[in-house]
Amino acid sequence: MRKIDLCLSSEGSEVILATSSDEKHPPENIIDGNPETFWTTTGMFPQEFIICFHKHVRIERLVIQSYFVQTLKIEKSTSKEPVDFEQWIEKDLVHTEGQLQNEEIVAHDGSATYLRFIIVSAFDHFASVHSVSAEGTVVSNLSS
């Protein structure tokens, strides 16, 4: 089974919810595969977004590129709908002045149909997420 970036919109994933949206920096930018685009929060925390894979996947490694994110929680769900999320990963990120935070996480028990990313706190009034990539495999399609 080949490993792919499961989060890319070109692989069928989509951001189905985001707590803030700026028309110049919409949440879809997180998964568009373009390193020049990003999603920005609009102040106040926590902020969150949910990625839907539209299939059952097994994630082995996550890479999150962001700016000013301080504490990040990641929850996962294996339901057909975006419900029943369980706490999966919580990380305190290091502030990197003038450059992107590049957080790589080796994932354990990475079965999911949805991921919810919660930016609990930030180093500034605003934070941005430039990309989320999830290396792994497709387990099965969601049955209707």
Curated annotation (Swiss-Prot):
Molecular-function GO term, any one: metal ion binding
Tagged with keyword Transport: yes
Gene Ontology CC annotation, any one: centrosome
Subcellular location(s) per record: Cell projection, Cilium
UniProt xrefs under InterPro entries: FA58C, Galactose-bd-like_sf, IFT25
UniProt KW keywords: Calcium, Cell projection, Cilium, Differentiation, Metal-binding, Protein transport, Spermatogenesis, Stress response, Transport
Keyword Protein transport: yes
Superkingdom of source: Eukaryota
Tissue: Detected in placenta.
Chain positions recorded as Ca(2+) binding sites: 29, 32, 37
Gene Ontology BP terms: cell differentiation; cilium assembly; heart development; intraciliary anterograde transport; kidney development; left/right axis specification; lung development; protein transport
Record note on quaternary structure: Component of the IFT complex B, at least composed of IFT20, IFT22, IFT25, IFT27, IFT46, IFT52, TRAF3IP1/IFT54, IFT57, IFT74, IFT80, IFT81, and IFT88. Interacts with IFT27. Interacts with IFT88.
Family membership noted in the UniProt record: Belongs to the IFT25 family.
Physiological role: Component of the IFT complex B required for sonic hedgehog/SHH signaling. May mediate transport of SHH components: required for the export of SMO and PTCH1 receptors out of the cilium and the accumulation of GLI2 at the ciliary tip in response to activation of the SHH pathway, suggesting it is involved in the dynamic transport of SHH signaling molecules within the cilium. Not required for ciliary assembly. Its role in intraflagellar transport is mainly seen in tissues rich in ciliated cells such as kidney and testis. Essential for male fertility, spermiogenesis and sperm flagella formation.
PANTHER family, per database record: INTRAFLAGELLAR TRANSPORT PROTEIN 25 HOMOLOG
Protein name listed in UniProt: Intraflagellar transport protein 25 homolog
Upper taxonomic lineage: Eukaryota, Metazoa, Chordata, Craniata, Vertebrata
